[in-house]
Swiss-Prot record:
It comes from the Eukaryota. Residues 378-396, 492-507, 799-814, 835-845 have a biased composition (Polar residues). It comes from Arabidopsis thaliana (Mouse-ear cress). It catalyses: L-seryl-[protein] + ATP = O-phospho-L-seryl-[protein] + ADP + H(+); L-threonyl-[protein] + ATP = O-phospho-L-threonyl-[protein] + ADP + H(+). Residues 285-422, 437-513, 792-860 are annotated as: Disordered. This is MAP3K epsilon protein kinase 2. Residues 293-306, 397-408, 475-491, 846-859 have a biased composition (Basic and acidic residues). GO terms for cellular component: microtubule organizing center; nucleolus; plasma membrane; vacuole. HEAT repeats lie at residues 25-62, 86-125, 218-256, 538-576, 577-614, 633-658, 659-700, 704-742, 850-888, 906-943, 1045-1066, 1067-1105, 1112-1150, 1154-1191, 1196-1236, 1257-1280, 1281-1317, 1347-1367. The lineage of its organism: Eukaryota, Viridiplantae, Streptophyta, Embryophyta, Tracheophyta. Expressed in both the sporophytic and the gametophytic tissues, especially in dividing cells. Mostly present in flower buds and mature flowers. Also accumulates in embryos and in roots. SUPFAM superfamilies: ARM repeat (SSF48371), Protein kinase-like (PK-like) (SSF56112). GO terms for biological process: cell division; protein autophosphorylation; regulation of cell division. Induction: Expression is cell cycle-regulated, with higher expression in G2-M phases. Disruption phenotype: Pollen lethality in plants lacking both MAP3KE1 and MAP3KE2, associated with plasma membrane irregularities following pollen mitosis I. Smaller plants with shorter roots due to reduced cell elongation in roots and reduced cell expansion in rosette leaves, as well as embryos arrest in the early stages of development.
Length: 1367
């Protein structure tokens, strides 16, 4: 019984109106489900589409049902037949012809047949076009062509389904907030609501072709909203590359952006792709297209493989040819290397024996220290040759002599050959420089090294023997060759008279008069002494050395600057330098003590600064491998000192740096660049300086840096605490720009992707925030005045280890004098003893941060005191010389005008040591760390001395004067690491500038103990405008120009990332990053604001970013920027804001509503009414507001938006869109406020005149909006009919387009039904005759072309008129 009841209920629920029985569900769409049905009267199978009536009004429902009744009259083999409709309380059921094989979209699924070949697609698309030709002739636009709406029978016949009704359902459902349905097939004009036409179906046909060929339509990899955006934005959808030329041309015609340029369906049927490929349907099905397609794929794969083999062979041949060419090419011959041309022709493999001979080429006028050291090292090397190497060395020597004899001048041949024997013996011990690797990597590197690392080629074995003469032999004639024996082309390279000269710069030829200056002067001095009756011989050689020192002191060396014991008499100092150099180098071994390694490293650093030529000796004889071994020692002091030594060696010498990279130094140094809790900041700084050299020295070193994963290291330097890590942040910014400027095949987008993946974007935004705060503070306090009329130059220089600012030739640094026991010296910088700094610094040698003599380079006080105590006297300045400047500091310390209270003046800490160690009571990190990074302490022409407060009270002084002087120093210096561009200062001027810096330093030291400003979490000092605490001083100390320069660089970097591909942009669209970026809109100056807005605009062009921008309240943050009315860059700012808002709000109703809620409509009105060039962005947004929401429409009405719409009817381009917006406002006019606005006489007259004067090409598009207007408002319908619209409608019935005729008949019917005097309308306009002519023309078939729906509509309207006439 229960089973029978269940069965009865089942059948009852499946029966529709006792006429159809519902079966299984066979499909599902946006507005309903499709079931198979059985006609209970005749047994026919039908398809029944079930549509919910929940969101459809009664009036719209009646219209849809009337449309279905009209479509029942259509009959064509390529369209699905409408059979009728049935309505229940909850659903509308549309009865359709059943097509048994289902849709093409279902057939091409991967689990079925998969994609179709072009031949089969041609068969199906030809039938689709046939169906469209019929529909368009009947005045019907399908509006939803896609694979799911193309059904097939088992005979292969194609039928178009779901035409006409689906779109009306969409229009009837005003609860939708965006374009719904199937966006991937939509034409741009459909998405933009600018008028649907028959050409919209042609666009959809193109999308369907790609769907059948690939299983998915264009942009299917995107979400629906981004896809809609791309359809509108892109010039054409992506077309697969593998298609034939004919089908590609066909698709390009379908995808014409302008709908008026697309061909109609009938024209496309005659396209070569369709015409050439059409064949009998059954024939095409008998021959499996899929099999043919697979065969074609296999054959094409074989061809590809053959082509690839040819490419490989071609590349291999090319490589062989390049190798042959390289092996035959001659290396450039420069200067002293001119006798090596034959050897240079050897292949790279020969360089294993001969490639290291570059050290034979140092000129005879090399400095004595280097020459004597060469002698000792060569002798020791010769003695240590192993027996196993003798045979090889002899062969090499004989071969070497054979090459060189023909090239060397005859009078030097014997000496040069003997010298080469000694040189090669030395190299065979293993101390040669790694030129072999350099050659294989870069021919330029070898040439540069031969120029940079030169040993005396003109000194033969005799000369080396004579250097070891007994002390009593003081004969000078054999020390130098006669001037006429010096080979031409030799250059004077050993001179270091200019402090900024580097080894590379020694390559340039010197004037002829400069050759052998040292020998000439020494000979002249000896001759003078002999003429005076004195002799050059002495038992102890003292007179000889005095003569040599006199010449050297004037010409080559500043002996007082050397780091040796000042108590040693001059006659004994010279040989001690060579001995000391050898001793220091020999101490650089892992088995030495920590103190010994550190001491030797720092002494070598000091020596290299005074004698840059010694670097070549060190590199030639030792290389970088011993230093790399020392870096493996897990001791901070050793690592710091060795890194400092490496930096000094490679400083400004690209060849040394490149060869250091070749032996693997980059990854090793990188390991010290990252942040670790137990790693001192000074080690990171040394590593950072080395990496900066890599970025700025040459493209080759930059490439090696990048290839060693250098970009993540640069990202790590963007520390959050900008005040504390300013140099590293600047390094990272400059380094990233160097990477981006690298001109290589690698795409810049790849670099962006690597950096973004490693978290650079959030760091850049935080840095932007910090720099903007720094710039703001500097602006509030007022930037420094420049006494000489020059403004501080914005720089992006290096973390120079020397901070050069003084020329050794012109002056020696001037410092505040202290008791001798309180200071030590190292190279040109001073250092406080532990006694002075113990109250503020830890003396722990494992924390080099605390021992910081020059602001950015580490020194170890306890070691340097021992290493450099011998040269204290060099830079001493008497107390009397500094009395005035020290007096000035007192008034500064008292803070008379700046509010710096003095507490414990006797214990004021040095400025830089103050920055390295925080007071115990301070809780906030980096409170005054800006001072530590004062521009000008970082990079100038000589090391700034350590600045620290004096115990003596100072008087006089003016803070503004000091800051002006300081800003001048800060603004100068190297530009991009070029030492030679730095200005020169006289001794007097430089002393004054140093005094100014010293006074600032002491004042900052005092202020730091009482400063009231604190740093934010990002390390930026926050202070009130006009504050007299430390913020004002810090703002001066950090040049506004410098901070602004880096602020712009960071903004430009963000812009680069915003322009990158979607993957990079996705990293930029995190919620926290965007929120932080938008917060800066009100904090930055217009130039930076414009760049941030450009970033936002670029992000908005990517559909995948729109949702993230919306979540970050981009619309809310952008709109206030439209309030800017005057000032710099206002137009550009408005342009970026409107463009971004346009991209965000286009298509999406929710975002349009959000924009309206945030007050965009008044701004849009202003741009439109003022006829601004930005009107192109404002108008679409303003018209979209009518479609957004009830609230947006209310705001439109309140701000006069309806009047703007009416005025746009005179604009040919915007008239159709404006009319559609008017129709939408009326359709949703609940309280009739919009209706009242349009019932005004002026509004009615504008609408009538617009209809009358509408251009022909727009006429078809305005009929549907007019139909909406008169069907939604009876009052406007009547008013328009009485004011001249009716005659215009009837007069246009002779239009030949079926779509136009059909809509005109609908309009006439709507007007007739609401007209107050229908009989008068019929008689005055002779309407029955007009309709009869339509029906008769249709019967003749001459003009109307079989327009079934037009005939049906005219006939039904004529019947209605006849009834009214009778009544």
């Amino acid at each position: 019984m229960a089973r029978q009841m269940t069965s009865s209920q089942f059948h009852k629920s499946k029966t529709l109106d006792n006429k159809y029985m519902l079966g299984d569900e066979i499909g599902k769409g946006a507005y309903g489900r499709v079931y198979i049905g059985l006609d209970l009267e005749n047994g026919d199978f039908v398809a029944i589409k079930q549509v919910s009536l929940e969101n459809i009004g009664q009036e719209d429902l009646n219209t849809i049902m009337q449309e279905i009744d009209l479509l029942k009259n259509l009959n064509h083999k390529n369209i699905v037949k409408y059979l009728g409709s049935l309505k229940t309380k909850t659903h509308l059921h549309i009865i359709l012809e059943y097509v048994e094989n289902g849709s093409l979209a279902n057939i091409i699924k991967p689990n079925k047949f998969g994609p179709f070949p072009e031949s089969l697609v041609t068969v199906y698309i030809a039938q689709v076009l046939e169906g469209l030709v019929y529909l368009h002739e009947q005045g019907v636009i399908h509006r939803d062509i896609k694979g799911a709406n193309i059904l097939t029978t088992k005979e292969g016949l194609v039928k178009l389904a779901d035409f006409g009704v689906a779109t009306k359902l969409n229009e009837a459902d005003f609860n939708t907030h965006s374009v719904v349905g199937t966006p991937y097939w939509m034409a741009p004009e459909v998405i933009e609501l600018s008028g649907v036409c028959a050409a919209s179906d042609i666009w959809s046909v193109g999308c369907t072709i790609i769907e059948l060929l690939t299983c998915v339509p264009p942009y299917y990899d995107l979400q629906p909203m981004p896809a809609l955006y791309r359809i509108v934005q892109d010039d054409t959808p992506p077309i697969p590359d593998s298609l034939s030329p004919d089908i590609t041309d066909f698709l390009r015609l379908c995808f014409k952006k302008d709908s008026r340029q697309r061909p109609d369906a009938k024209t496309l049927l005659s396209h070569p792709w369709i015409r050439n490929s059409r064949r009998a349907l059954r024939s095409s099905l008998r021959h499996s297209g899929t099999i043919r397609y697979m065969k074609e794929t296999d054959s094409s794969s074989e061809k590809d493989a053959e082509g690839s083999q040819e490419v490989v062979e071609s590349v291999s041949a090319e490589k062989v040819e390049v190798t042959k060419t390289n092996s035959k090419s001659k290396l450039p011959v420069i200067g002293g290397a001119s006798f090596r041309s034959e050897k240079d022709q050897s292949s790279p493999s020969d360089l294993g024996e001969e490639g290291t001979d570059s050290e034979d080429d140092i000129n005879s006028d090399q400095g004595p220290t280097l020459s004597m050291h060469d002698k000792s090292s060569r002798q020791s090397g010769t003695c240590s040759i192993s027996s196993d190497a003798k045979g090889t060395s002899q062969d090499v020597l004989e071969n070497h002599e054979k090459y060189d004899r023909d090239e060397i001048p005859g009078n030097l041949e014997t000496e040069a050959s003997e010298g080469r024997r000694n040189t090669l013996a030395t190299k065979l011990v293993g101390k040669e420089y790694s030129i072999q690797s350099s050659h294989s990597f870069s021919q330029k590197g070898e040439d540069g090294l031969r120029k940079a690392v030169k040993t005396p080629s003109s000194f033969g074995g005799n000369e080396l023997t004579r250097f070891s003469d007994p002390p009593g032999d003081a004969s000078l004639h054999d020390l130098f060759h006669p001037l006429d024996k010096v080979p031409e082309g030799k250059t004077n390279e050993a001179s270091t008279s200019t402090p900024t000269a580097n080894v590379n710069q020694g390559d340039s030829p010197v004037a002829d008069g400069g050759k052998n200056d040292l020998a000439t002067k020494l000979r002249a001095r000896i001759a003078q002494k002999q003429m005076e009756g004195e002799t050059g011989h002495s038992q102890d050689g003292g007179d000889l050395f005095r003569l040599m020192m006199g010449v050297l002191k004037d010409d080559v060396l500043n002996i007082d600057d050397l780091v040796f014991d000042e108590k040693v008499p001059p006659e004994n100092l010279f040989p001690l330098q060579a001995v000391e150099f050898s001793r220091l180098v020999s101490s650089l071994r892992p088995d030495e003590s920590e103190d010994a390694i550190v001491t030797s490293s720092l002494k070598l650093v000091a020596m290299f600064r005074q004698r840059p030529g010694q670097k070549a000796v060190f590199v030639t004889q030792n290389g970088f491998l011993p230093l790399m071994d020392l870096l493996d020692i897990p001791k901070s002091r050793v690592i710091c000192a060795v890194l400092q030594l490496i930096n000094e060696i490679v400083k400004d010498n690209t060849d040394f740096l490149e060869n250091a990279c070749l032996v693997g130094l980059i990854p090793l140094v990188m390991s010290f660049a990252g942040f670790e809790r137990d790693r001192s900041r000074e080690i990171r700084k040394e590593a950072a300086y080395f990496l900066q050299q890599l970025c700025q020295s040459s493209p080759l070193t930059l490439q090696m840096f990048i290839s060693c994963r250098g970009i993540p290291v640069l990202v790590g330097f963007l520390e959050a605490d900008y005040a504390k890590h300013r140099e590293m942040v600047h390094l990272a910014i400059d380094g990233m720009w160097q990477v981006f400027k690298l001109k290589k095949s690698t795409s810049r987008n790849d670099f962006c992707r690597i950096a973004a993946k490693n978290g650079i974007l959030l760091r850049l935004v935080n840095t932007l925030y910090s720099l903007s705060e720094a710039t703001r503070l500097a602006s509030i306090s007022g930037d420094a005045l420049i006494l000489d009329g020059q403004t501080p130059r914005a720089r992006s220089g290096q973390l120079d280890p020397n901070n050069p600012i003084f020329s050794q030739r012109e002056t020696s640094p001037s410092v505040i004098d202290h008791p001798d026991g309180l200071k030590t010296r190292n190279g040109g910088g001073e250092e406080p003893s532990h006694a002075l700094t113990s109250n503020s610094q830890s003396s722990d040698v494992h924390q080099p941060d605390a021992l910081h003599p020059d602001g950015d380079r580490p020194r170890l006080s306890s070691v340097v005191a021992d290493a450099t105590e011998d040269v204290i006297q060099q830079h001493r300045i008497s107390l009397s010389a500094n009395r005035t400047s020290t007096d000035k500091l007192q008034k500064l310390a008292e803070g008379a005008s700046n509010g710096f209270p003095v507490t414990q003046p006797d214990q004021v800490r040095p400025l830089l040591s103050l920055l390295e160690k925080e007071p115990p009571s301070r809780k906030i990190s980096g409170q005054l760390d800006y001072v530590k990074h004062i521009a000008g302490i970082e990079r100038h022409e000589s090391r700034l001395p350590l600045l620290y407060a004096s115990d003596e009270k100072k008087t006089n002084g003016d803070l503004e004067f000091i800051m002006a002087e300081f800003a001048e120093v800060s603004g100068r210096g190297k530009e991009n690491g070029n030492l030679d561009t730095a200005p020169r200062y006289s001794s007097k001027t430089m002393t004054k500038k140093v005094m100014a810096i010293e006074r600032v330093a002491s004042t900052c030291g005092i202020a730091s103990q009482t400063a009231s400003g604190v740093l934010s979490g990002s390390g930026v000092l926050n202070a009130r405008p006009g504050s007299t605490t430390s913020s004002g001083l810090l703002a001066h100390a950090l040049s506004a120009d410098v901070s602004m320069d880096y602020l712009e660089k960071v903004a430009d970097l963000l812009l680069e990332f915003a322009r990158a591909e979607t993957t990079v942009k996705s990293y930029m669209c995190s919620q926290s990053l965007l929120s932080r970026l938008f917060q800066m809109f009100n904090r930055v100056e217009p130039p930076i604001l414009l760049k941030i807005l450009e970033c936002t605009n670029h992000l908005s062009t990517d559909p995948n970013c729109l949702e993230n921008l919306q979540r970050a309240d981009a619309i809310k943050q952008l709109i206030p920027n439209l309030e800017l009315k005057e000032g710099p860059l206002v137009y550009q700012i408005h342009h970026e804001v409107l463009s971004a808002l346009f991209n965000l709000c286009k298509i999406n109703k929710r975002r349009q509503e959000q924009a309206a809620e945030n007050g965009i409509i008044p701004h849009l009105m202003l741009f439109v009414m003022s006829d601004s060039p930005l009107k192109q962005y404002a108008l679409p947004l303003l018209c979209d507001m009518a479609h957004a929401s009830r609230n947006s429409r209310e705001q439109l009405r309140a701000h006069g938006g309806l009047d703007v719409y009416l005025s746009l009817l005179d604009d040919e381009y915007w008239s159709v869109i404006a009319l559609d917006s008017i129709a939408v406002c009326l359709a949703q006019d609940v309280d009739q406020k919009v209706e009242q606005a349009f019932l005004k006489k002026d509004a009615i007259q504008k609408l009538v005149n617009f209809f009358q004067n509408c251009p022909e090409r727009h006429f078809v598009h305005i009929l549907e909006p007019f139909l909406k207007i008169i069907t939604k408002s009876s009052s406007i319908n009547k008013t328009l009919a009485l004011n001249g619209l009716t005659p215009l409608l009837i007069a246009r019935l002779d239009h030949q387009d079926a779509i136009a005729r059909l809509n005109l008949l609908k309009l006439i019917k709507a007007v007739y039904e609401k007209h107050p005097k229908p009989k008068q309308l019929i008689v005055e306009n002779d309407l029955p005759q007009k309709l009869q002519n339509l029906i008769e023309e249709r019967r003749d078939g001459q003009r109307s072309g079989g327009q079934v729906l037009v005939k049906q509509m005219a006939t039904s309207l004529l019947k209605a008129l006849h009834i009214n006439t009778i009544l």
